[in-house]
Amino acid sequence: MTKVGLRIDVDTLRGTREGVPRLLATLHRQGVQASFFFSVGPDNMGRHLWRLIRPRFLWKMLRSNAASLYGWDILLAGTAWPGKNIGNANAGIIRETATYHETGLHAWDHHAWQTHSGHWSIRQLEEDIARGITALEAIIGKPVTCSAAAGWRADGRVVRAKEPFNLRYNSDCRGTTLFRPLLMPGQTGTPQIPVTLPTWDEVIGPAVQAQSFNTWIISRMLQDKGTPVYTIHAEVEGIVHQPLFEDLLVRARDAGITFCPLGELLPTSPESLPLGQIVRGHIPGREGWLGCQQAASAS
């Protein structure tokens, strides 16, 4: 049996309002639990449209047919009008999710984090994280114990900024296996659970067709030599491609794959995890930099 961590990122108002309820129903039907990471502040995702002047981002949008994939309400959110507060508008849905699934913070403002966190000070990072955690805890009525950086925009500064919040784990980068981030010689931070597998929007296009994606990603899960972690998005697999996602759950189970919340991947003694660090890097299919796992030594 292959155990795969299932991470669900919720970036937008529509993803929360429409995608999450469908995903909850899908997961219930298939007897699967996952980790949901919510954006709880303003939905300003439409402000990413200026990135269309960048060739790699434009190609990604064309390759994934973004207008039909996400919908124009997502692509234009927060452009001509102030972005609506996601958490306030969908508190009931978020609370219901937290009743049945592991629930953590994705971001206060997904667009702001993805655009500006790379040059924020440690203090600015801490303030933004605190704002998101405070809002999410007020909604779910219990402590937030995990987080996942929006767009995998994370480096050593982000690791340090999250330390005061005493989280059980973070999922801030791409990599191969769980690790303890090295803060300084002799001091390690909160365990990291990297995403190891590509997302739909990173690979769909000429190389992998939509109708063959499930076969392709299941093969990648079974071949993963580390600790497999797969990310879906409420805006994609919860709306337009919900039937394909449910088919993936069925076919994965038949292939001997069991999905689980990321927290279940943690060992009893996190001290046994290898050391590592998060550095800025690039991966195929994703525009811009993101956090990538790198080995580190204790010396």
UniProtKB/Swiss-Prot annotation:
List keywords of the entry alphabetically: Antibiotic resistance, Hydrolase, Lipid A biosynthesis, Lipid biosynthesis, Lipid metabolism, Lipopolysaccharide biosynthesis
Annotated GO MF terms: hydrolase activity, acting on carbon-nitrogen (but not peptide) bonds, in linear amides
Any one GO CC term of this protein is:
membrane
Kindly state a single biological-process term from the GO annotations of this entry: response to antibiotic
Q: Signal peptide position in this chain? A: none
Pathway membership: Glycolipid biosynthesis; 4-amino-4-deoxy-alpha-L-arabinose undecaprenyl phosphate biosynthesis; 4-amino-4-deoxy-alpha-L-arabinose undecaprenyl phosphate from UDP-4-deoxy-4-formamido-beta-L-arabinose and undecaprenyl phosphate: step 2/2; Bacterial outer membrane biogenesis; lipopolysaccharide biosynthesis
- Report if keyword 4Fe-4S is assigned: no
Question: Which reaction(s) does its UniProt entry say it catalyses?
Answer: 4-deoxy-4-formamido-alpha-L-arabinopyranosyl di-trans,octa-cis-undecaprenyl phosphate + H2O = 4-amino-4-deoxy-alpha-L-arabinopyranosyl di-trans,octa-cis-undecaprenyl phosphate + formate
* UniProt keyword Lipid biosynthesis present: yes
Any Pfam family the entry gives:
Polysacc_deac_1
The chain positions of domain NodB homology read: 2-260
Q: What is its EC number?
A: 3.5.1.n3
In terms of InterPro entries, this protein maps to:
ArnD (IPR023557), Glyco_hydro/deAcase_b/a-brl (IPR011330), NODB_dom (IPR002509), Polysacc_deacetylase_ArnD (IPR050248)
List the HAMAP family. Answer: ArnD
What is the similarity comment for this entry?
Answer: Belongs to the polysaccharide deacetylase family. ArnD deformylase subfamily.
Tell me, in a sentence or two, what this protein's role is: Catalyzes the deformylation of 4-deoxy-4-formamido-L-arabinose-phosphoundecaprenol to 4-amino-4-deoxy-L-arabinose-phosphoundecaprenol. The modified arabinose is attached to lipid A and is required for resistance to polymyxin and cationic antimicrobial peptides.
What NCBIfam families would the database entry show? PRK15394.1 (NF011923)
Q: What protein does this entry describe?
A: Probable 4-deoxy-4-formamido-L-arabinose-phosphoundecaprenol deformylase ArnD
